[in-house]
Amino acid sequence: MRHALKLLLLSLVLAATVDGLAWAGFDEALKAYQAKDFSTALSEARRAAGAGDPRSSLLLGAMYQAGQGVEADQTQAVSHYETAAKGGVIGAFSKLAQAYSRGAGVARDREKALAYARRAAQLGDLEGTFFLSVILTAEYLGYLDPGGKPDDKKYWQLAGRPLSERGIDTEARDALYWSADKGYPLAMMTMALNMGGSIGDGNRKRMQALIDKMPNNSYPALQNYGRISKHMDTLGDSFTSPQLFFDAQAQQMVAAMLQTCGLRDRKEMDKLPMPKLIATKITKPVSNAVYLPSKVAGYDRAYLIAGDWEEGWTYTGCDKTATVTIKFTADGLGGARIVSEQTMKGR
């Protein structure tokens, strides 16, 4: 009995010693990695991984993936990520999702990529949750043709789905909302761009708040959205997104020129001064509104699927003022289109 007890105690001591060495090895590996001493990081991570620390397997996977201290080997990277995932390291699931999505080191498998991304999201991993949004949007909700151009047929097929068939839409957007709210940089930028191009209550404010949190933002499209949004704020009320506001300008400008300057022929446009937009007003709020459901607090009205509204845009030109009445209808995928000829009231 005493002999058995001694063996048990010895095994516990040895296990604790091995665990301690593994933890120490990982700490040394991480410290060396952060100092860009990849040779030391590699040897320490290998030692710790061999002692059973799954965190070191994650680090090894990252080093093999990037070719840091060792020749890049995507197959080895995936192998280490799998070991880390089996050991319960949260960050490994996102890496595996990305590997299977790209077909890097493994055969491309969309379903496995999605399963790993969902597992990462369930565990609260920011990178994995954001990637869940990416893979759902690109693989299941995308409407680009093989050449990267919009496929109108695919777009309208997606836009015409009933709410009962939009579970993936909600999952994708909620993953984006959550990871952006938690401060994941790529999610913040992606959501800011998304808010700049989609119709929803408070989307411009959300976009601007995200831009303000990214002072070093150098993405041209996002900078343009920011400028357009601030200009819209000076004009009054509008339910349009910065993208829709920009897209509608040319058509409304012609309508305004007809009334303010008496434009009779498009050929005269070059000879006449361009009217200036001086005010916007929502004349009829959104009716028959349908929003994409969300499980993330505060986003239940962030993505308009169906609904109609009307706005009056006031222009000045040729010493006259005219208000152009515009009717919008949601297009089913967060955008909207003009559905009727404009009417103009001049004074």
Q: Which residue ranges define each predicted feature?
A:
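Cysteine-centric segments in proteins
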Residues: S164, S218-R347
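Alpha-helical segment of the N-proximal tetratricopeptide repeat
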Residues: G25-A51
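Short helix-capping/linker turns of helical repeat alpha-solenoids
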Residues: G50-D53, A66-Q68, G87-V89, R102-A104, ...
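TPR/TPR-like (Sel1-like) alpha-helical repeat modules
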Residues: D174-D181, N203-P220
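Hydrophobic face of amphipathic alpha-helices that form TPR/SEL1-like repeat modules
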Residues: G25-A32, L59-A66, K95-R102, F131-E139, ...
